Amino acid sequence: MITDASIDRIAAREAASFRAANPKSLTLAQQASTNWFQGVPFHWMLDWPSPAPLVAAHAQGAVLTTVDGRKLDDFCLGDTASMFGHSPKPLADAIAKQAGEGLSYMLPTEKGVELGEMLARMFGLPRWQVTTTASEANRAVIRWCRGITGRKKILIFNGCYHGAVDDVFVDLRPHPSGWESKMRASLIGQVHDILPTTSVIEFNDLEALESTLKRGDIACVLAEPVMTNVGMVRDAPGYLDALRRLCSETGTMLVFDETHTISSGYGGHSNAFGPKPDMMVIGKSIGGGISTAVYGFSDEIAERMAKLNASRPSGHSGIGTTLSANALAIAAMHAMVGKVITHDAYRHMLELARRLVKGIESVIETHRLPWHVVNVGARVEFVCADRPSTNGSEARAAMHPKLEAAIHLYLANRGILLAPFHNMMLLSPATQEGQVDRLVHILDAAVTEFLE
Protein backbone atom coordinates (compact mmCIF):
# COMPACT_ATOMS: atom_id res chain seq x y z
CA MET A 1 0.00 0.00 0.00
CA ILE A 2 1.26 3.47 -0.85
CA THR A 3 0.72 5.79 2.11
CA ASP A 4 0.55 9.58 2.32
CA ALA A 5 3.60 9.47 4.58
CA SER A 6 5.57 7.62 1.91
CA ILE A 7 4.47 10.08 -0.77
CA ASP A 8 5.41 13.10 1.37
CA ARG A 9 8.80 11.65 2.30
CA ILE A 10 9.80 10.81 -1.26
CA ALA A 11 8.39 14.05 -2.68
CA ALA A 12 10.47 16.11 -0.24
CA ARG A 13 13.61 14.13 -1.06
CA GLU A 14 13.03 14.44 -4.80
CA ALA A 15 12.41 18.19 -4.54
CA ALA A 16 15.78 18.57 -2.82
CA SER A 17 17.43 16.43 -5.50
CA PHE A 18 15.83 18.57 -8.19
CA ARG A 19 17.24 21.75 -6.68
CA ALA A 20 20.72 20.25 -6.49
CA ALA A 21 20.65 18.96 -10.08
CA ASN A 22 19.22 22.06 -11.74
CA PRO A 23 21.00 25.14 -10.33
CA LYS A 24 20.90 27.16 -13.55
CA SER A 25 17.18 26.52 -14.06
CA LEU A 26 16.54 27.77 -10.53
CA THR A 27 18.74 30.83 -11.02
CA LEU A 28 16.98 31.71 -14.27
CA ALA A 29 13.59 31.21 -12.63
CA GLN A 30 14.55 33.74 -9.98
CA GLN A 31 15.89 36.15 -12.60
CA ALA A 32 12.75 35.81 -14.73
CA SER A 33 10.50 36.77 -11.81
CA THR A 34 11.67 40.38 -12.17
CA ASN A 35 9.85 40.89 -15.47
CA TRP A 36 7.70 37.89 -16.24
CA PHE A 37 4.49 37.55 -14.24
CA GLN A 38 5.16 34.83 -11.65
CA GLY A 39 8.49 34.16 -13.34
CA VAL A 40 7.31 32.60 -16.60
CA PRO A 41 6.21 33.98 -19.99
CA PHE A 42 3.02 31.89 -19.82
CA HIS A 43 1.44 30.93 -16.51
CA TRP A 44 0.77 27.31 -17.53
CA MET A 45 4.52 26.77 -17.28
CA LEU A 46 4.02 26.77 -13.51
CA ASP A 47 1.93 23.60 -13.71
CA TRP A 48 4.99 21.33 -13.59
CA PRO A 49 5.19 19.50 -10.23
CA SER A 50 8.78 20.59 -9.58
CA PRO A 51 10.20 23.39 -7.40
CA ALA A 52 10.60 25.41 -10.62
CA PRO A 53 10.15 24.59 -14.29
CA LEU A 54 13.13 23.07 -16.04
CA VAL A 55 14.57 25.64 -18.44
CA ALA A 56 14.99 24.14 -21.90
CA ALA A 57 18.11 24.73 -23.98
CA HIS A 58 17.13 22.70 -27.03
CA ALA A 59 15.37 19.52 -28.11
CA GLN A 60 15.72 17.08 -30.97
CA GLY A 61 13.60 14.06 -31.75
CA ALA A 62 12.50 12.66 -28.39
CA VAL A 63 15.28 14.13 -26.23
CA LEU A 64 15.14 17.46 -24.43
CA THR A 65 18.28 19.15 -23.07
CA THR A 66 18.10 21.68 -20.24
CA VAL A 67 20.30 24.70 -19.54
CA ASP A 68 21.99 22.59 -16.87
CA GLY A 69 23.09 20.13 -19.55
CA ARG A 70 20.70 17.40 -18.45
CA LYS A 71 19.23 15.22 -21.19
CA LEU A 72 15.73 13.85 -20.66
CA ASP A 73 13.81 11.26 -22.65
CA ASP A 74 10.82 13.41 -23.59
CA PHE A 75 7.42 11.74 -23.39
CA CYS A 76 5.63 15.06 -22.89
CA LEU A 77 6.61 16.43 -26.29
CA GLY A 78 5.26 19.88 -25.62
CA ASP A 79 1.94 18.42 -24.41
CA THR A 80 1.22 17.14 -27.95
CA ALA A 81 2.55 20.10 -29.96
CA SER A 82 5.69 18.07 -30.79
CA MET A 83 4.00 14.66 -30.81
CA PHE A 84 5.81 13.78 -34.04
CA GLY A 85 9.19 14.69 -32.55
CA HIS A 86 11.06 17.90 -31.87
CA SER A 87 12.26 19.69 -35.01
CA PRO A 88 11.97 16.88 -37.57
CA LYS A 89 14.24 17.76 -40.49
CA PRO A 90 11.49 18.37 -43.09
CA LEU A 91 9.84 20.84 -40.71
CA ALA A 92 13.08 22.59 -39.76
CA ASP A 93 14.07 22.91 -43.41
CA ALA A 94 10.65 24.28 -44.41
CA ILE A 95 10.66 26.86 -41.62
CA ALA A 96 14.19 28.00 -42.45
CA LYS A 97 13.34 28.37 -46.14
CA GLN A 98 10.13 30.28 -45.45
CA ALA A 99 11.90 32.58 -42.99
CA GLY A 100 13.94 33.94 -45.88
CA GLU A 101 10.92 34.43 -48.12
CA GLY A 102 8.49 36.27 -45.86
CA LEU A 103 6.40 35.06 -42.96
CA SER A 104 2.95 36.59 -43.31
CA TYR A 105 1.41 38.14 -46.44
CA MET A 106 -2.34 37.87 -45.83
CA LEU A 107 -2.33 36.24 -49.26
CA PRO A 108 -2.59 32.57 -50.28
CA THR A 109 0.47 30.62 -51.41
CA GLU A 110 1.05 27.74 -53.79
CA LYS A 111 1.96 25.53 -50.83
CA GLY A 112 -1.41 26.42 -49.34
CA VAL A 113 -3.22 25.05 -52.39
CA GLU A 114 -1.28 21.80 -52.07
CA LEU A 115 -1.90 21.69 -48.31
CA GLY A 116 -5.67 21.82 -48.79
CA GLU A 117 -5.47 18.78 -51.06
CA MET A 118 -3.23 16.97 -48.57
CA LEU A 119 -5.59 17.65 -45.64
CA ALA A 120 -8.56 16.34 -47.62
CA ARG A 121 -6.70 13.11 -48.40
CA MET A 122 -5.44 12.60 -44.86
CA PHE A 123 -8.61 13.37 -42.91
CA GLY A 124 -11.38 12.53 -45.38
CA LEU A 125 -13.14 15.91 -45.34
CA PRO A 126 -13.03 18.02 -48.52
CA ARG A 127 -13.14 21.63 -47.24
CA TRP A 128 -10.74 23.35 -44.82
CA GLN A 129 -9.89 26.59 -43.03
CA VAL A 130 -6.79 27.60 -41.05
CA THR A 131 -6.61 29.30 -37.65
CA THR A 132 -3.78 30.20 -35.29
CA THR A 133 -4.74 27.71 -32.55
CA ALA A 134 -7.16 24.86 -31.92
CA SER A 135 -8.93 27.13 -29.41
CA GLU A 136 -9.62 29.57 -32.21
CA ALA A 137 -10.72 26.75 -34.51
CA ASN A 138 -13.23 25.52 -31.94
CA ARG A 139 -14.58 29.04 -31.45
CA ALA A 140 -14.98 29.39 -35.22
CA VAL A 141 -16.72 26.04 -35.54
CA ILE A 142 -19.20 26.93 -32.79
CA ARG A 143 -20.05 30.20 -34.56
CA TRP A 144 -20.50 28.48 -37.92
CA CYS A 145 -22.70 25.76 -36.43
CA ARG A 146 -24.91 28.28 -34.66
CA GLY A 147 -25.10 30.35 -37.81
CA ILE A 148 -26.06 27.60 -40.24
CA THR A 149 -28.52 25.86 -37.92
CA GLY A 150 -30.12 28.95 -36.40
CA ARG A 151 -29.75 27.31 -32.98
CA LYS A 152 -28.05 28.90 -29.99
CA LYS A 153 -27.15 25.91 -27.81
CA ILE A 154 -24.18 23.57 -27.97
CA LEU A 155 -23.69 20.25 -26.19
CA ILE A 156 -20.45 19.22 -24.49
CA PHE A 157 -19.38 16.40 -22.18
CA ASN A 158 -18.59 16.81 -18.51
CA GLY A 159 -14.87 17.22 -17.92
CA CYS A 160 -14.09 18.23 -21.49
CA TYR A 161 -11.51 20.78 -22.55
CA HIS A 162 -11.47 22.39 -25.97
CA GLY A 163 -9.03 25.21 -25.37
CA ALA A 164 -9.71 28.78 -24.30
CA VAL A 165 -13.32 28.74 -25.49
CA ASP A 166 -15.79 30.41 -23.14
CA ASP A 167 -18.71 28.28 -24.29
CA VAL A 168 -17.24 25.00 -23.04
CA PHE A 169 -16.35 25.90 -19.44
CA VAL A 170 -19.39 24.23 -17.92
CA ASP A 171 -19.31 21.23 -15.59
CA LEU A 172 -21.75 18.92 -13.89
CA ARG A 173 -21.52 19.20 -10.12
CA PRO A 174 -23.25 17.31 -7.29
CA HIS A 175 -26.47 18.88 -6.03
CA PRO A 176 -28.94 17.73 -3.34
CA SER A 177 -31.41 16.90 -6.09
CA GLY A 178 -28.81 15.12 -8.24
CA TRP A 179 -26.52 16.99 -10.63
CA GLU A 180 -26.55 20.55 -11.90
CA SER A 181 -24.69 22.50 -14.56
CA LYS A 182 -22.24 25.05 -13.18
CA MET A 183 -19.75 27.35 -14.83
CA ARG A 184 -16.20 26.32 -14.02
CA ALA A 185 -15.26 28.06 -10.77
CA SER A 186 -11.61 28.53 -11.73
CA LEU A 187 -12.29 30.92 -14.63
CA ILE A 188 -10.61 34.32 -14.44
CA GLY A 189 -12.71 37.40 -15.18
CA GLN A 190 -15.74 35.47 -16.41
CA VAL A 191 -18.66 37.87 -16.91
CA HIS A 192 -21.18 36.30 -19.25
CA ASP A 193 -23.49 33.52 -18.11
CA ILE A 194 -23.03 30.72 -20.62
CA LEU A 195 -25.38 28.24 -18.92
CA PRO A 196 -28.40 29.17 -21.09
CA THR A 197 -26.51 28.28 -24.28
CA THR A 198 -24.30 25.35 -23.22
CA SER A 199 -25.72 21.98 -22.22
CA VAL A 200 -23.49 19.43 -20.52
CA ILE A 201 -24.00 15.70 -19.97
CA GLU A 202 -21.79 12.79 -19.00
CA PHE A 203 -19.85 11.02 -21.74
CA ASN A 204 -21.26 7.55 -22.52
CA ASP A 205 -24.70 8.45 -21.10
CA LEU A 206 -26.85 7.42 -24.05
CA GLU A 207 -30.16 8.27 -22.37
CA ALA A 208 -29.05 11.83 -21.59
CA LEU A 209 -27.64 12.22 -25.09
CA GLU A 210 -30.86 11.11 -26.73
CA SER A 211 -33.14 13.27 -24.58
CA THR A 212 -30.94 16.35 -25.03
CA LEU A 213 -30.60 16.11 -28.81
CA LYS A 214 -34.25 15.28 -29.39
CA ARG A 215 -35.21 18.69 -28.00
CA GLY A 216 -34.06 19.98 -31.38
CA ASP A 217 -32.28 23.08 -30.08
CA ILE A 218 -28.63 21.97 -30.17
CA ALA A 219 -26.49 23.52 -32.92
CA CYS A 220 -23.57 21.14 -32.47
CA VAL A 221 -22.06 18.51 -30.25
CA LEU A 222 -18.42 19.43 -29.66
CA ALA A 223 -16.51 16.38 -28.47
CA GLU A 224 -13.32 14.43 -28.47
CA PRO A 225 -14.10 10.92 -29.75
CA VAL A 226 -12.15 9.77 -26.70
CA MET A 227 -11.89 12.16 -23.77
CA THR A 228 -8.24 13.02 -23.02
CA ASN A 229 -8.25 16.12 -20.84
CA VAL A 230 -9.75 14.67 -17.67
CA GLY A 231 -7.54 11.62 -17.79
CA MET A 232 -8.65 9.33 -20.60
CA VAL A 233 -12.22 8.11 -20.98
CA ARG A 234 -12.88 5.62 -23.77
CA ASP A 235 -16.18 5.50 -25.61
CA ALA A 236 -18.47 2.63 -24.65
CA PRO A 237 -19.20 0.15 -27.47
CA GLY A 238 -21.69 1.71 -29.87
CA TYR A 239 -21.77 5.11 -28.19
CA LEU A 240 -20.10 7.11 -30.95
CA ASP A 241 -22.23 5.41 -33.60
CA ALA A 242 -25.33 6.37 -31.60
CA LEU A 243 -23.99 9.92 -31.32
CA ARG A 244 -23.54 10.07 -35.11
CA ARG A 245 -27.04 8.69 -35.73
CA LEU A 246 -28.75 11.04 -33.27
CA CYS A 247 -26.96 14.08 -34.66
CA SER A 248 -28.08 13.17 -38.18
CA GLU A 249 -31.66 12.57 -37.06
CA THR A 250 -31.93 15.88 -35.19
CA GLY A 251 -30.09 18.18 -37.60
CA THR A 252 -27.26 18.65 -35.11
CA MET A 253 -23.70 19.17 -36.32
CA LEU A 254 -21.23 16.60 -34.98
CA VAL A 255 -17.83 18.19 -34.38
CA PHE A 256 -14.82 16.12 -33.33
CA ASP A 257 -11.93 17.99 -31.76
CA GLU A 258 -9.09 15.65 -32.75
CA THR A 259 -6.27 17.84 -31.48
CA HIS A 260 -5.28 15.06 -29.06
CA THR A 261 -6.93 12.00 -30.59
CA ILE A 262 -4.88 12.35 -33.77
CA SER A 263 -2.67 10.00 -31.71
CA SER A 264 -5.09 7.16 -32.58
CA GLY A 265 -3.88 6.66 -36.12
CA TYR A 266 -3.40 8.18 -39.55
CA GLY A 267 -6.19 10.68 -40.21
CA GLY A 268 -7.22 10.80 -36.56
CA HIS A 269 -9.51 8.66 -34.43
CA SER A 270 -12.58 9.11 -36.61
CA ASN A 271 -10.76 7.85 -39.69
CA ALA A 272 -9.16 4.97 -37.83
CA PHE A 273 -12.30 3.83 -36.02
CA GLY A 274 -15.26 5.98 -37.12
CA PRO A 275 -17.75 7.51 -37.19
CA LYS A 276 -17.28 10.42 -39.57
CA PRO A 277 -18.07 13.87 -38.14
CA ASP A 278 -19.57 16.84 -39.96
CA MET A 279 -16.64 18.99 -38.88
CA MET A 280 -13.21 18.24 -37.44
CA VAL A 281 -10.61 20.33 -35.59
CA ILE A 282 -6.89 19.52 -35.48
CA GLY A 283 -4.33 21.69 -33.70
CA LYS A 284 -1.00 21.51 -31.89
CA SER A 285 0.94 18.75 -33.68
CA ILE A 286 -0.39 19.59 -37.16
CA GLY A 287 2.20 22.39 -37.26
CA GLY A 288 4.88 20.51 -35.36
CA GLY A 289 5.03 23.24 -32.70
CA ILE A 290 4.31 26.24 -34.92
CA SER A 291 1.12 27.92 -33.68
CA THR A 292 -1.53 26.87 -36.16
CA ALA A 293 -4.62 24.68 -36.49
CA VAL A 294 -7.21 23.67 -39.06
CA TYR A 295 -10.86 22.76 -39.21
CA GLY A 296 -12.44 20.69 -41.94
CA PHE A 297 -16.00 20.06 -43.05
CA SER A 298 -18.15 18.43 -45.70
CA ASP A 299 -19.21 19.92 -49.03
CA GLU A 300 -22.79 20.16 -47.77
CA ILE A 301 -21.68 22.13 -44.71
CA ALA A 302 -19.52 24.34 -46.94
CA GLU A 303 -22.55 25.24 -49.08
CA ARG A 304 -24.54 26.24 -46.00
CA MET A 305 -21.61 28.28 -44.69
CA ALA A 306 -21.28 30.08 -48.03
CA LYS A 307 -25.00 30.98 -48.10
CA LEU A 308 -24.78 32.30 -44.54
CA ASN A 309 -21.69 34.32 -45.36
CA ALA A 310 -23.35 35.85 -48.42
CA SER A 311 -26.52 36.76 -46.53
CA ARG A 312 -25.03 38.54 -43.53
CA PRO A 313 -24.41 42.31 -43.31
CA SER A 314 -20.94 43.54 -44.19
CA GLY A 315 -18.44 43.74 -41.34
CA HIS A 316 -16.33 41.46 -39.20
CA SER A 317 -17.62 37.91 -38.90
CA GLY A 318 -16.15 37.33 -35.45
CA ILE A 319 -14.06 34.54 -36.97
CA GLY A 320 -10.33 34.69 -37.66
CA THR A 321 -7.24 36.76 -36.89
CA THR A 322 -4.65 38.60 -38.97
CA LEU A 323 -2.07 35.84 -38.55
CA SER A 324 -4.41 32.99 -39.47
CA ALA A 325 -3.03 30.97 -42.41
CA ASN A 326 0.20 32.96 -42.49
CA ALA A 327 2.91 31.71 -44.84
CA LEU A 328 5.05 30.25 -42.05
CA ALA A 329 2.13 28.22 -40.67
CA ILE A 330 1.24 26.95 -44.14
CA ALA A 331 4.85 25.93 -44.81
CA ALA A 332 5.06 24.13 -41.46
CA MET A 333 1.84 22.17 -42.01
CA HIS A 334 2.83 21.38 -45.59
CA ALA A 335 6.03 19.76 -44.31
CA MET A 336 4.32 17.96 -41.42
CA VAL A 337 1.40 16.54 -43.39
CA GLY A 338 3.51 15.74 -46.44
CA LYS A 339 6.65 14.27 -44.90
CA VAL A 340 6.36 13.71 -41.13
CA ILE A 341 2.82 12.55 -40.25
CA THR A 342 3.01 9.36 -42.29
CA HIS A 343 1.73 5.79 -42.17
CA ASP A 344 5.26 4.63 -41.32
CA ALA A 345 5.43 7.12 -38.45
CA TYR A 346 2.21 5.74 -36.99
CA ARG A 347 3.37 2.15 -37.32
CA HIS A 348 6.42 2.99 -35.21
CA MET A 349 4.46 5.05 -32.68
CA LEU A 350 1.72 2.48 -32.16
CA GLU A 351 4.20 -0.38 -31.83
CA LEU A 352 6.05 1.53 -29.11
CA ALA A 353 2.75 2.39 -27.41
CA ARG A 354 1.92 -1.31 -27.17
CA ARG A 355 5.38 -1.92 -25.70
CA LEU A 356 4.89 0.83 -23.13
CA VAL A 357 1.41 -0.35 -22.16
CA LYS A 358 2.68 -3.91 -21.72
CA GLY A 359 5.62 -2.71 -19.63
CA ILE A 360 3.53 -0.58 -17.28
CA GLU A 361 0.93 -3.33 -16.93
CA SER A 362 3.76 -5.64 -15.90
CA VAL A 363 4.81 -3.17 -13.19
CA ILE A 364 1.22 -2.94 -11.96
CA GLU A 365 0.86 -6.73 -11.89
CA THR A 366 4.23 -7.32 -10.21
CA HIS A 367 3.44 -4.93 -7.37
CA ARG A 368 -0.27 -5.80 -7.23
CA LEU A 369 -1.24 -2.17 -7.56
CA PRO A 370 -4.90 -1.11 -7.87
CA TRP A 371 -3.99 0.80 -11.03
CA HIS A 372 -4.67 0.44 -14.74
CA VAL A 373 -3.29 1.66 -18.06
CA VAL A 374 -5.31 3.36 -20.78
CA ASN A 375 -4.16 4.47 -24.19
CA VAL A 376 -5.48 6.24 -27.26
CA GLY A 377 -3.05 5.03 -29.89
CA ALA A 378 0.31 6.67 -29.18
CA ARG A 379 -1.05 8.48 -26.09
CA VAL A 380 -0.68 6.49 -22.87
CA GLU A 381 -1.51 7.05 -19.19
CA PHE A 382 -1.33 4.99 -16.03
CA VAL A 383 -4.15 5.76 -13.63
CA CYS A 384 -3.96 5.23 -9.88
CA ALA A 385 -7.39 3.59 -9.77
CA ASP A 386 -8.44 -0.02 -10.22
CA ARG A 387 -10.79 0.36 -13.20
CA PRO A 388 -11.21 2.55 -16.27
CA SER A 389 -13.50 5.56 -15.95
CA THR A 390 -16.64 5.75 -18.05
CA ASN A 391 -17.24 9.50 -17.74
CA GLY A 392 -15.69 12.76 -16.60
CA SER A 393 -16.94 12.56 -13.02
CA GLU A 394 -15.40 9.12 -12.53
CA ALA A 395 -12.17 10.28 -14.15
CA ARG A 396 -11.89 13.25 -11.78
CA ALA A 397 -12.51 11.00 -8.80
CA ALA A 398 -9.79 8.59 -9.98
CA MET A 399 -7.08 11.23 -9.91
CA HIS A 400 -4.44 11.19 -7.17
CA PRO A 401 -2.68 14.54 -7.69
CA LYS A 402 -0.19 14.21 -4.85
CA LEU A 403 0.99 10.74 -5.89
CA GLU A 404 1.01 11.68 -9.58
CA ALA A 405 3.19 14.73 -8.82
CA ALA A 406 5.63 12.73 -6.73
CA ILE A 407 6.02 10.06 -9.43
CA HIS A 408 6.48 12.74 -12.07
CA LEU A 409 9.30 14.39 -10.11
CA TYR A 410 10.94 11.02 -9.35
CA LEU A 411 11.06 10.22 -13.06
CA ALA A 412 12.20 13.72 -14.08
CA ASN A 413 15.14 13.50 -11.68
CA ARG A 414 16.18 10.31 -13.47
CA GLY A 415 15.91 11.62 -17.00
CA ILE A 416 12.30 10.83 -17.91
CA LEU A 417 9.93 13.70 -18.70
CA LEU A 418 6.19 13.04 -18.59
CA ALA A 419 3.45 15.60 -19.22
CA PRO A 420 2.60 17.69 -16.15
CA PHE A 421 -1.09 16.85 -16.55
CA HIS A 422 -2.00 13.42 -15.09
CA ASN A 423 1.37 11.98 -16.24
CA MET A 424 0.38 11.53 -19.86
CA MET A 425 3.00 9.96 -22.17
CA LEU A 426 3.37 10.28 -25.93
CA LEU A 427 5.33 8.08 -28.32
CA SER A 428 6.83 9.87 -31.31
CA PRO A 429 8.42 8.61 -34.54
CA ALA A 430 11.77 9.53 -32.95
CA THR A 431 11.19 7.63 -29.69
CA GLN A 432 13.31 4.49 -29.32
CA GLU A 433 12.64 1.15 -27.62
CA GLY A 434 15.43 1.85 -25.14
CA GLN A 435 13.69 5.02 -23.98
CA VAL A 436 10.45 3.12 -23.42
CA ASP A 437 12.22 0.35 -21.51
CA ARG A 438 14.08 2.89 -19.39
CA LEU A 439 10.80 4.60 -18.46
CA VAL A 440 9.29 1.28 -17.39
CA HIS A 441 12.40 0.36 -15.39
CA ILE A 442 12.46 3.68 -13.52
CA LEU A 443 8.71 3.56 -12.88
CA ASP A 444 9.20 0.10 -11.37
CA ALA A 445 11.94 1.48 -9.11
CA ALA A 446 9.69 4.37 -8.09
CA VAL A 447 6.80 2.09 -7.19
CA THR A 448 9.15 -0.13 -5.18
CA GLU A 449 10.21 2.86 -3.10
CA PHE A 450 6.70 4.22 -2.64
CA LEU A 451 5.56 0.83 -1.34
CA GLU A 452 8.30 0.60 1.29
Where are these regions (language model features)?
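Conserved N-terminal phosphate-binding loop of PLP-dependent enzymes in the Aspartate aminotransferase
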Residues: 1-452
